[in-house]
Amino acid sequence: MTPINFHKKEKPLTSLVSLGGGAAGMANAGLEGKTYVEDVYKSYPYRANGDPTQTITTGLDISGDGGLVWVKNRTNVGNHTLQDSLIGDDKYIVTSSANGSGENDTRIKTITSTGFQVGSDGDTGGSAVKYASFNFKKSEGFFDLVEYTGNSSASQTIAHGLGCVPGCFMLKSLSTNGDWRVWHRSIQPNTTQYGITLNGTGATYGTIDEFGSTDPTATQFTVGGNKN
């Protein structure tokens, strides 16, 4: 029996169900052509220098296929600041606020082929401040980003590209103010009727007005009247 060498790429993402977890099998572990966690996700700490154009090199190319950069100050109190490949350069959203996307070239300036670039704002690039970054690359079976325009109907279907049933999804209005709404399959199994508010401190709540009454599938999810 050959032991597993943990310094080698011997465990790909096998049937990982979005952010909900759940690796289903080891039958093909170690085969060529598989997707590995380090190919699509990187936790990367850095120390900023106050330079308004500091480049952070994570080694993860998000600019090509798309993805999300999530930054949090580790030294001082500060917001969780997010930029993704959909909202574009010099724009951001924060998880503690109901505000739509903001525009500020001193936070996360741009996503690059090797990481991202920050400005000198204290939430992302303050001099001598330590930060943590969480970097997600769009990849089937792991992570996807979808932008849609609501139609004010009681039930609107939104297509996604995961290729599997999502384990978790988050909704946030970009053009207007609106709470972050989060659904996760572990909150209440086999139903989308319960969720949490990311920018709040309350307990779970009924979500039929946000996520509709239809469970997500491998190709789409449903939003209710409050989120379209």
List each language-model region with its residue ranges:
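Surface-exposed molecular-recognition determinants
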Residues: 2-228
